[in-house]
A protein has these predicted regions:
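Alpha/beta-hydrolase-fold catalytic nucleophile elbow
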Residues: 142-145, 164, 197-198
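Conserved alpha/beta-hydrolase "acid-adjacent" motif
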Residues: 170-179
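Primarily recognizes the serine-hydrolase "nucleophile elbow" in alpha/beta-hydrolase
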Residues: 107-158
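Catalytic active-site module of serine/aspartate enzymes centered on a nucleophile-bearing elbow/loop
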Residues: 211-235
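Hydrophobic beta-strand scaffold residues
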Residues: 71-72, 161, 192
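Serine-hydrolase catalytic machinery in alpha/beta-hydrolase-like enzymes
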Residues: 4-117, 204-209
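Short beta-strand/loop motif that positions the catalytic acidic residue
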Residues: 157, 163-165
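Catalytic histidine neighborhood in serine/cysteine hydrolases
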Residues: 184-208
Length: 235
């Protein structure tokens, strides 16, 4: 079930933001692309409810690209991000039009397009990554302040997974994240890295307050951990 935390500190969307470019179709979806076409490894960044035009998300894409990756930020919301001010579409109603299962299926289309480009290894970060991690389609994932994920989901993970949790999180509280770690530690076949960031809330890595030095520092640390995980498992 969606938590109000998933909507805190909404971004001011910018369709022209970022150092990369927007294309009308990548794997059948409009997408923001960053990085070199000559890269051999790719990363898919999957947005939260506010979509692929979020400025911080595109900044993250640009920084991941600087580490040698071809980065895709698909518009899984099809031009319909959640708008808190729209009283006609409260979050539960909006979610019915954008079920995570749909994003999972469309992510597989993006993975197929990356393979057609010759990418030898593919990682993903953001929403639905745990579902992707249950398949053989992807080589590494990073779950940032994960949403509705269960212990049973984690038991099905087949690829290296990093879980970066928040101390203040109603959707995946620290107690649950620690259970995830216990499950992963018992599975010697799946590499894992689990970390709980103190003093931050769900969504902090992409919807932090730029005027909050501690929040900015934590978001930077989460990005460094994300890139390090991909460097370790995709290159």
């Amino acid at each position: 079930m969606a938590s109000s935390q998933c909507c805190d500190n909404p971004p001011a969307l910018n369709p022209t933001g970022g150092e990369g470019k927007v294309v009308d179709s990548f794997g059948g979806l409009k997408a923001y692309l960053a990085g070199s076409n000559d890269a051999k490894a790719a990363v898919i960044l999957i947005s939260d409810v506010f979509g692929f035009e979020a400025p911080n998300l595109r900044k993250i894409a640009d920084k991941v690209a600087l580490s040698g990756y071809f980065v895709v930020v698909p518009d899984f919301l099809h031009g319909d991000p959640y708008v808190p001010e729209n009283a006609e579409k409260p979050l539960p109603v909006w979610m019915k039009s954008h079920p995570p299962k749909m994003g999972f299926q469309e992510a597989k289309q993006v993975i197929a397009a990356l393979k057609e480009k010759g990418m030898s290894s593919i990682g993903a970060a953001g929403m639905v990554v745990v579902e992707l991690a249950k398949t053989q389609e992807i080589q590494a994932v990073v779950a940032l302040h994960p949403g509705p994920v269960t212990v049973e989901d984690i038991k099905e993970v087949k690829c290296p997974i990093s879980i970066l949790g928040a101390e203040i999180d109603q959707m995946s509280p620290p107690e649950l994240v620690k259970q995830f770690e216990q499950v992963l530690s018992a599975n010697s076949e799946v590499a894992h890295f689990v970390k709980i960031f103190p003093g931050v809330a769900h969504g902090w890595s992409v919807r932090y307050n730029h005027d909050d030095a501690a929040a900015v520092k934590s978001a930077k640390e989460a990005l460094e951990d994300t890139i390090n995980w991909f460097n370790k498992n995709l290159k």
